[in-house]
From Swiss-Prot:
Subunit structure: Homotetramer.
Job of this protein: Removes 5-oxoproline from various penultimate amino acid residues except L-proline.
Lineage, uppermost ranks: Bacteria, Pseudomonadati, Pseudomonadota, Gammaproteobacteria, Enterobacterales
GO BP annotation list: proteolysis
Protein name, UniProt field: Pyrrolidone-carboxylate peptidase
One family name in Pfam for this protein: Peptidase_C15
Keyword Cytoplasm annotated: yes
Name of the encoding gene: pcp
Major site of localization recorded for this protein: cytoplasm
Covalent S-S links between cysteines: none
GO molecular function: pyroglutamyl-peptidase activity
């Protein structure tokens, strides 16, 4: 049976939970659309997170890797288009590291595009009634670090495995502590991930629909 690896993060910046892991952990060792899903929780730490990711890829030998992370303030499922080769941490990670203007990979290319059909995934989520959009930036913190490191590793291995990154909003419990911020219930995020997994099984090439932004 084919395997899809989904990663998520531990809590950071004083939060009690990370909604990415709350949504992802329920999929571990489940069958979705005829594939086995395995989940891995990453540390919110520069470099260590990539070590953990690479070990999980080596252990599970997946056909697809979907990394998931929290983006407090976003209102929908954000399917990331691109990762850039820069670490520029506005806050420290969970071990106190705060790199500024350092590369994720020394002498690596400036950026990598997701190898997932990002627009098709967003379209599938819309059909399922789940708010979603294409995002043009994964930030410059550990999420972008993981996305870039993932795509670099997969490229080094011949781009046989597809990979990308998805940002999700706060959970309602978190939003209650951040007045005015949007949220999405954890079961809906889990359902969104299932929709994306099923779409990936039938969609290799992206669809030609707009997913751009004016700013």
């Amino acid at each position: 049976m084919k395997t899809v690896l989904i990663t998520a993060f531990e809590p950071f910046e004083g939060e009690a939970i990370n909604p990415s892991w709350e949504a992802v952990k329920d999929l571990h060792q489940r069958e979705v659309g005829g594939v086995r899903v395995v989940a891995c929780r990453l540390s919110c730490v520069f470099d260590l997170s990539l070590d953990q990711l690479y070990r999980a890829i080596a252990e599970w030998q997946p056909e697809v890797v979907i990394a998931v992370g929290q983006a407090g303030g976003r209102a929908d499922i954000s399917v990331e288009r691109v990762a850039i080769n820069i670490n520029d941490a506005r806050i420290a990670d969970n071990r106190g590291n705060q790199p500024i203007d350092t590369p994720v990979v020394e002498k690596g290319p400036a950026a990598y595009f997701s190898t997932l059909p990002v627009k098709a995934l967003v379209q599938a989520l819309h059909v399922a009634g789940i708010p979603a959009s294409v995002s043009q930036t994964a930030g410059t913190f550990v999420c972008n670090h993981v996305m870039y490191g993932l795509l670099h590793q997969l490229h080094q291995q011949g781009d046989v495995v597809r990979g990308g990154f998805v940002h999700i909003p706060y959970s309602p419990e978190q939003a209650a502590r951040h007045p005015g911020e949007p949220s999405m219930p954890t079961p809906l995020v889990t359902a969104a991930l299932e929709v994306m997994i099923k779409q990936l099984l039938v969609q290799q090439v992206d669809v030609a629909i707009t997913g751009g932004a004016l700013h």
